[in-house]
């Protein structure tokens, strides 16, 4: 099973991916945690480009979309190969490119070989709350920009059947909702939920 956490910066993706992976391990599952960009050479190049001053220009966004698609192929062989019988929990997946690098049709085409998650959990949060969590220091943490990203995430969630979780609450409440979503997929009874 491939589980992906999506959401704007500051929504808690990294925290909840780690907590979910830990919970699944406690319930006897072999779990692999991944993130996008990955730790591959391509992922390192992506992180470098994301921190450049021109990261939001159209040409750099197109380059990033192509690099992200290539980076996802480094995951595909693991997810569909060695890890096929295990659980993969990811902090982002190809849906991030749809909201950050769009337009949607082009991003779908270049990601046609990217692994598709079985479950996507969108951690939805108000832009101002997310910016407070992040400290508002990142180039991508501009309120108008993030509001557009959030809106695109909500549209994708509606169109693609993501589970949407209110991420403005405390960690335990958010994690409880995530576990309630995932428990039926794993045959975990309610006693295994916070």
UniProtKB/Swiss-Prot annotation:
SUPFAM superfamilies: P-loop containing nucleoside triphosphate hydrolases. It comes from Methanothermobacter thermautotrophicus (strain ATCC 29096 / DSM 1053 / JCM 10044 / NBRC 100330 / Delta H) (Methanobacterium thermoautotrophicum). It comes from the Archaea. Keywords: ATP-binding, Kinase, Nucleotide biosynthesis, Nucleotide-binding, Transferase. Its EC number is 2.7.4.9. ATP binds at residues 7-14. This is Probable thymidylate kinase. GO terms for molecular function: ATP binding; dTMP kinase activity. Belongs to the thymidylate kinase family. It is an enzyme of class 2 (transferase). CDD domains: TMPK (cd01672). HAMAP family: Thymidylate_kinase. GO terms for biological process: dTDP biosynthetic process; dTTP biosynthetic process; dUDP biosynthetic process. It holds the Pfam family Thymidylate_kin. InterPro entries: P-loop_NTPase, Thymidylate_kin-like_dom, Thymidylate_kin_CS, Thymidylate_kinase. One of its GO terms (cellular component) is cytoplasm. It catalyses: dTMP + ATP = dTDP + ADP. The gene is tmk.
């Amino acid at each position: 099973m491939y589980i992906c956490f999506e959401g704007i910066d500051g929504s808690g993706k990294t925290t909840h991916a780690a907590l979910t992976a830990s919970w699944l391990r406690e319930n006897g599952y072999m779990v692999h945690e991944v993130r996008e960009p990955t730790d591959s050479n391509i992922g390192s190049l992506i992180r470098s480009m994301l921190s450049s001053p021109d990261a939001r220009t159209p040409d750099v966004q197109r380059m990033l979309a192509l690099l992200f698609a290539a980076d996802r192929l480094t995951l595909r062989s693991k997810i569909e190969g060695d890890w096929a019988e295990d659980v993969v929990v990811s902090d982002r997946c190809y849906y991030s490119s749809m909201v950050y690098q769009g337009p949607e049709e082009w991003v779908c085409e270049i990601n046609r070989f990217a692994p598709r998650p079985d479950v996507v959990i969108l951690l939805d949060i108000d832009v101002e709350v997310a910016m407070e969590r992040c400290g508002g220091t990142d180039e991508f943490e501009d309120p108008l920009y993030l509001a557009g990203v959030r809106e695109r995430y909500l549209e994708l969630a509606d169109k693609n059947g993501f589970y949407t979780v209110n991420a403005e609450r405390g960690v335990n409440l958010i994690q409880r909702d995530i576990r309630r979503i995932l428990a039926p997929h794993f045959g975990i009874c309610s006693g295994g939920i916070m």
